[in-house]
Structure formats: structure tokens, C-alpha cells
Amino acid sequence: MLGVGFVFFFFSRFFGGLQTTLRPFSFSFGLAPLECPPPAAKPAFAIEDVKSPFTLRSNVSSTKKKEKNKPSYTFPVPQPKLESQWREMEWTEEQKASLMKTISSYRPSCHEGTQARVLLLGPVGSGKSSFISSVQSVFNGRVTNRAMVGTSSTSFTKKLQSFNIHGQKGEDPTGLVLCDIVGLGGGEMTGLTLHDILSVIKGHAPEGHKFSPDQPVRSETVGYIKKPGLKDKIHCVAFVVDASKILTYPKDLSTTFRLLRKHISDLDIHQVALLTQIDQMCPETAKDVTQVYKSRIIQDMMNKAGDLLGMSTSYIVPVKNYSSELDLNVNNDVLLLRAVDHILQYTDLHFQDNAPQHTGPKIDLGI
């Protein structure tokens, strides 16, 4: 009995001391404390008020950087081709030469504006800079990267850059200027504001202006153009969207596009759209770009791009930019040149709409 009592005394003292020692870390299973709900996530392409201008920027998680080596989209299930092209195209050297001549000789119908200024607008990585370089490559006769192109998830272009497309060797520059700016959804510190976009279109933003949401274009901005002429303004806007990302773009991007289109339309500026990366969507088109208008997949992507932009597909043209190629391809050149010709048609409408009205000399009717 003495031994049993001793053991009982020992264990009671030991566990009693242990309980006292661990009391601050003990858990009770009563009612769980009330917790504040997590803050609602901001939309990926939010339009936020920043000291009066609206910021169009992305709040997408940085985890995308870890996945940058993954393909953005895999080929859909192959579908039977259409029997005929749903847009008429001629894939010949003669057609390429004809389009190049048309573009090279183009001059705005209004004498005040000597060049047609086209602004490219689209999400980061949509192919704006690549399109500029691809078009210039066609006229250079070899693949060149005139507009610097990046591959990161943030916008490589940080400032307003205007590229006058040069004609073929020995020819004068064309009457076309393609303007490149930071992509939509460029991040917290490089976001593009609606205020700045409209300032560029109205002709107030100086060439080389570096965009920052906390330093919007104002009259105090260095180089600010107080009274822009027609030559300083944008005459057409071309939205650029990546076909391989249409199904993964944030839903709020459509709202952003529609807001932009409303404000741009209020300025009487015509708008078109370029659908890039078509070769990543359709294996047949990747092999042979002449199949683009026979592809049901591309036709479906065109419709989806129209829904995203709130735009009829008649304004949208598919293109394949030069990226890894070292040599030009005549069929790809024709597709690119048709896109430029499409842009110029709507650009010229702007000049026609804004041409000065000449009423002619007054006639004395002797009344």
C-alpha cells in the first residue's frame, strides 16, 4: 500500500505541475470567436479613381510570373474547315505589291494632317509593339524589331512612342504613324489612366511622355500641348487582343473596353481591332496562314473578341505577328498589310468627317 500511495502521489504532483505549466497554451472548444470576412478581391482590370483620373490596371496575382513558361492556351479540338473563305483574300505576290503601293501612297484627305496617327490599345502582352515591328518588317524586306518588345507579364512599353512606318528602300516614309503606349493592366505603379488615354487621343500628351497613375498628363506636364492641331491628335484607335488569352482574360476587362470605347466614340474617333496570336489557336492556320478564313476556330475567336470589345466582327481583323521567324512569308505579309489597309480606311473616315466645310463664294442674287 505504501508503494501504491507513493506512485499516486508522484503522478499527481507531476501532472498537476505540468497542467499548471501548460495552462497559458490550453485550448477550449467553446464558441469560435467572430472573424471579420476577408476583403473582397479587386477585379483584375479595375477602374479606380486616382485624384480624378481613372486608373486602368491589373491586380492579377504575381503567380502568373511563375507560369510564364507555360503555354497560355492549348489547341482546341480540331474542327472541320469551312468549304470557302468567309472573307475574300488573295494570297499572291501581286496582292502584296498592290497593298504596299496603296499604303505607301496613302496621304490623309485633309491637308492639315500630313500623317495618319493610329493609337494601339490593348492588355499587356497583346502584341501591340510586335504588330508595329511586323508591319515595318514587311516594308524593310526582312524581319526587324523596330518597336522594342518584351516577354514579361508587365508592360515593356512605358511611354508614348510614335513610329512613322518607313516605305521601301529609296521611297518616302508612308503617311501612317502607329502610336504605342503602356498596356492596360500594367500593375499598381504603371497603370494607364483613362485621363491619360484621352489626353493622348486629344493630342495633349507630348511624345516620350512616361505614364504614371500618380502623375497624370496636365497643363504643367513638360511638353504639354495646350492647343493641339489635327496633326497632334489620334485619328483612329486600334484595339489589340490576344486570341490565345480571350478565354482567360478577366471578366472586368470587357467593362474596361466598353468604357474606353464610349469615351473614344464621344470624340468621334473610329475604332477597329486586331486579333493576334491566331497561330496559337488553330493548328491548320499555324501551318498555313492562308487557312485563317476557313478556320471555324478563328471564326469563333473573332466572335468572342467582338463580345469582349462590344464591337461588330466587321471591325476586327486577324493578324500573325513575326516573333521567332528570321524570314518573311508572303502570305503572312498579305494578312498584315490587309490589316493596315483596314485601319487606314477608318482613319480616312475621320479626316472626311472633320474636313473643313467650304461653302464657296457668296452669290449676289440681286434681290
Named regions from a protein language model:
Residues 2-4, 18, 27-123, 156-171, ...:
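Short, flexible boundary segments at extreme N-termini or domain junctions of P-loop NTPases and their
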Residues 5-13:
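Hydrophobic alpha-helical signal peptides and transmembrane signal-/tail-anchor segments
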Residues 106, 110-112, 123, 135-269, ...:
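Switch- and interface-adjacent substructures of P-loop NTPase systems
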Residues 119, 270-273:
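A structural signal for isolated positions on well-ordered beta-strands in alpha/beta enzyme cores
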Residues 300-305:
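Two-metal-ion acidic nuclease core segments, chiefly of the RNase H-like superfamily
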